Amino acid sequence: MMCGRYAISKVVKKTKNIININEGVEDSDNYNAYPTQLLPIIKKDGDILMMTNYHWGLIPKWSEKMSDFRPLNNARLETLMDKRTFSGLIAKQRCVVPADGYYEWRKNDEGKKFPYFIKHEHNEIFFFSALYQKNTNLEFSVITTEAKGTILDIHHRMPVILKEEEIENYLSSKDPMAFLNSHQNPELVFYEVGRDVNNPSNNFIELLDPA
């Protein structure tokens, strides 16, 4: 699974200059955010930017009676318009997900996986482009694209990552697919971290320490 864990800390403080309304998001730290959790997203409500909590992982209405269906944590940019689950959301149900960085697992020649933390080169908060829906739960899915540059050393996929000044363009775009397809991710850096992050129940700042 691509982009299945990330870290976000002091999200209220870090977004205070861009958010107009905070709908119940607390300024807590989450160093091991994982799918199904209730996590902060930012979306437009008319002309204002609102931050609220949604569950990570879309469950389409057509799958609600399928007991073995796995929530869709990621949405591939290349096939967004081909998938009925996502094609109806891209026009008006776009959001961004604030993050300090995300975890990815690198596989060595023996098939063993080692976790890495990937972040902005200047330690700035960034934002995953995402889609949301209001179904039985409030849910979102992170949009991913082909990895480029040094990130390919870790994984062949990565989130579509926005800088703060790009949020409005994405959320307000009249042609969001053109925006996403022409978008260039910011420069990122990465380093290996300890295996404590493998356990979703672990949630402490030391998860970010280099291995």
Task: Tell me the role of every PLM-derived stretch.
Residues 1-211:
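Short linear sequence motif anchored by a di-proline
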